[in-house]
Amino acid sequence: MEKLVVLVVDDEEGIRSGISRILNNFRVGFPFLEDDFEYDIHEVGTGEDALDFIKNNKTDIMLLDNKLPGIYGIDVLEYLNKNKFDIQVMMITSYSSLELAVKATQNGAFNFVPKPFTPQELKSAMESITKHLFLKRMTNKMTQDDKELRHQFL
């Protein structure tokens, strides 16, 4: 079973712990794979702590609130985009606006889930982002394998 590292960034501890509880035993699988994906979940309460975490830990998926003390979530997202971190980001915020959704999408957010959300909505969004991440990595590996194969024949 492959574990994906998930960072939950929200200033509300209740939201963070609720997300962790929902995803703790949740698995995502493909019919053609033997093993499912599961999550290794970490929580932080500020944008600064999120940046510290990703600089020191491999992170696959980030669930990111926008309204954070200090650095806002959209600023964290811009940092990830500017510095080319390979992290799939799902924005989770109760302060949603069309402008924020557009800016988040332009900066690479995969999904935008407004709070409050149900456990099923969160699981569905996580299934989607996990499958997207798997397919993206598979495509990148195939592209790399193709380049190596071409190089061998040159």
Could you describe each region identified by the protein language model?
Residues 46, 72-75, 96:
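Acidic catalytic/metal-coordinating carboxylates
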Residues 99, 117-126:
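C-terminal output helix
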Residues 10, 65, 93:
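Active-site residues of response regulator receiver
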Residues 13-42:
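Two-component/phosphorelay signaling modules centered on CheY-like receiver
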Residues 133-154:
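CheY-like receiver
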Residues 25-28, 52, 74-85:
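Short amphipathic alpha-helix used as the core "switch/output" element in two-component signaling
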Residues 35-61:
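Acidic, metal-coordinating helix/loop segments flanking the phosphotransfer/catalytic sites
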